[in-house]
Amino acid sequence: DGYAHLINKYIKEGRCTFLDVKQKEILLEELTQIQKQKIRDTCFNIVLNDTSGKPQDLRLFAKNYNYTLIIFYDPSCEHCKVEVPKMDSTIAVLEQQLLVKIGKYAICNAFNITKNEWINFIQEHHLDLNYIHVTLGNDMPIRKAYDAFTNPLFYLVDRDGLLLAKKTSSKNLRKELINAFQHFK
């Protein structure tokens, strides 16, 4: 949303004077892509390779759970080292309280990270129950679609891939899940 806000404010409204027409067109096209991700719309699908190099499809993964949390993180990010395990603990509690099964599609959103650093992060924080770990690498279309230019980020989808929450937090996840229950009654 922050990236979209900047494009809207400075490019779309004409405040930016140093970019040429072609550069502005590219950014406006990106804005259109970002704005396609609306709550209750089908999420932009992601197919990325896991730690063993096998492609993992987000929507197919999501079908195995009541809900799936899409997690963008960087193993070297200090904030991620706190927030990702905190979200994992929150999910464990919510699964018991709400009697739901929540999958975690965790995306390593780091440009220059070694496979060992990536796997060490997963193991050190015990991020293994109902997880698929994939790496984003330099995939800009996915990064743009999810406005994943900061870490960590959390998105919530249902088993059909409907986007229920964007950029949520461990604090707000319970509210988002209860809201999803009420919407489908």
Identify the residue ranges that each predicted region occupies:
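Short active-site neighborhood of thiol/selenol oxidoreductases, capturing the structured segment around
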Residues: 57-88, 105
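Structural microenvironment flanking redox-active thiols in thiol-disulfide oxidoreductases
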Residues: 82-124, 138-143
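Short, small/polar residue-rich loop motifs at catalytic or cofactor-binding pockets
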Residues: 42, 66, 149-151
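Extended hydrophobic-aromatic, low-complexity segments
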Residues: 70, 78-83, 115-118, 164-167
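Thiol/disulfide oxidoreductase modules built on the thioredoxin-like
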Residues: 137-179
